[in-house]
Amino acid sequence: MISKPDKNKIRQKRHRRVRGKLSGTADRPRLNVFRSNTGIYAQVIDDVAGVTLASASTLDKEVSKGTKTEQAVVVGKLVAERAVAKGISEVVFDRGGYLYHGRVKALADAARENGLKF
């Protein structure tokens, strides 16, 4: 019987490969996206200091209603507003090994519309 590849292991391998090439600094931190079956999480990270500067997720009270894509838009808006409030305007987008499509794209577009540049 032919074995089926594990999608998450392939994604993790892709994410490790990309993470070797990009890093967030204090001037231009990394906007990391994690997508689960039920939610989406976004963090603005300074990799040099190892500190999360801003974050938002579907666990926040403001993000309870709507489809998963609509929730991703709200998470993108929230993380952008929180980052801009801390004086961060430019980030490096880390899609976490996911395809730039659907919820990940919706989050990225909402973050761009609300003041983050990448």
Swiss-Prot record:
One biological process term in Gene Ontology: translation
Keyword rRNA-binding: yes
Entries under InterPro entries matching the protein: Ribosomal_uL18_bac-type, Ribosomal_uL18_bac/euk
Superkingdom as given in the UniProt entry: Bacteria
Annotated GO MF terms: 5S rRNA binding; structural constituent of ribosome
CDD domains (UniProt xref): Ribosomal_L18_L5e
Keywords (A to Z) from UniProt: Ribonucleoprotein, Ribosomal protein, RNA-binding, rRNA-binding
Gene3D superfamilies the UniProt entry points to: 3.30.420.100
Cellular component, GO annotation: cytosolic large ribosomal subunit
Region (Disordered): 1-26
Bias kind Basic residues: ranges: 10-20
Pfam families (UniProt xref): Ribosomal_L18p
Family as reported in the entry's similarity comment: Belongs to the universal ribosomal protein uL18 family.
Job description of the protein: This is one of the proteins that bind and probably mediate the attachment of the 5S RNA into the large ribosomal subunit, where it forms part of the central protuberance.
Subunit and interaction comment: Part of the 50S ribosomal subunit; part of the 5S rRNA/L5/L18/L25 subcomplex. Contacts the 5S and 23S rRNAs.
Name this protein carries in UniProt: Large ribosomal subunit protein uL18
Upper classification of the organism: Bacteria, Bacillati, Bacillota, Bacilli, Lactobacillales
